[in-house]
């Protein structure tokens, strides 16, 4: 319970605390636009990272959809430090487009939880994912040179974003062929998300799982992740190498853990 209270505090801080960095740290490959999200009855600010050679090339690119865009590219907009996604991808010369979706501030918990929690509420991730799949992705595929097939489409996030990214692979397996699941907050919908996975018959998604062993006062983050991986492996041979799991010694529930783990995840997922 103490762990859950600490995590919920972090979740709320994501939505309410502003960073006072004086200058933007986003690279010139990053741009933004706003799009209506009728499923959520709001508008969403979208961040777009394009590879360094995008403008000089005619090739098509795989796409990664990521949550909490405020924390991905720019220290000025982040809660407690950015992921440095743009700088890391530039250094790798990664041939991938990243689409960051800003969280809904005080609606973050609501948008990034598949089911309503009796204590904390939420439960509108289905609407949020419908926005991504039916409104945002078509816009991205029309505007940019993308490889739109599921094998070239990844979804990635941390904490509630990790939970919703996993849920997305069960809800839309025909859309998302890969996922980066960092410190997933399975606990907030534990009963429902495990039941959903148990009912799932086939699973071909490629998963990269990451969490730290010091994310709370108990080991529920690690045990939940181990349990979920076990359930997945009961439906396919581990020899297929479709999932990778990293438990970081001393890793805590914060941007540093996710920032430090991003490159290894990207490389393992094929970028």
Describe every region a protein language model picked out:
Residues 22-271:
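Non-catalytic cap/lid and distal C-terminal segments of serine-dependent acyl enzymes
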Residues 1-25:
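Bacterial Sec-dependent N-terminal signal peptides
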């Amino acid at each position: 319970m103490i762990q859950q209270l600490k995590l919920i505090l972090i979740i709320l801080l994501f939505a309410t605390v502003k960073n006072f960095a004086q200058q933007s740290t986003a690279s010139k490959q990053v741009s933004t636009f706003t799009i209506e999200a009728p499923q959520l009855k709001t508008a969403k600010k979208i961040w777009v990272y394009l590879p360094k050679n995008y403008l000089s090339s005619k090739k098509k690119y795989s796409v990664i959809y990521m949550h909490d865009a405020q924390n991905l590219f720019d220290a000025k907009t982040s809660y407690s430090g950015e992921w440095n996604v743009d700088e890391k991808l530039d250094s790798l010369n990664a041939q991938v487009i990243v689409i960051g979706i800003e969280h809904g501030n005080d609606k973050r918990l609501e948008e990034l939880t598949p089911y309503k929690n009796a204590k904390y509420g939420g439960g509108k991730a289905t609407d949020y994912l419908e926005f991504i799949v039916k409104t945002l992705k078509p816009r991205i595929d029309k505007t940019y040179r993308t490889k739109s097939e599921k094998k070239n489409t990844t979804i990635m996030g941390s904490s509630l974003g990790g939970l919703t990214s996993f849920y997305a692979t069960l809800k839309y397996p025909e859309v998302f062929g890969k996922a980066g699941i960092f410190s997933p907050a399975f606990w907030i919908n534990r009963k429902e998300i495990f039941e959903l996975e148990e009912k799932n018959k086939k699973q071909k998604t490629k998963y990269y799982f990451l969490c730290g062993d010091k994310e709370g006062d108990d080991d529920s983050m690690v045990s939940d992740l181990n349990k979920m991986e076990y359930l997945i492996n009961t439906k396919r041979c581990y020899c297929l190498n479709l999932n990778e799991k990293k438990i970081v010694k001393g890793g805590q529930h914060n941007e540093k853990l996710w920032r430090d783990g991003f490159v290894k995840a990207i490389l393992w997922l094929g970028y």
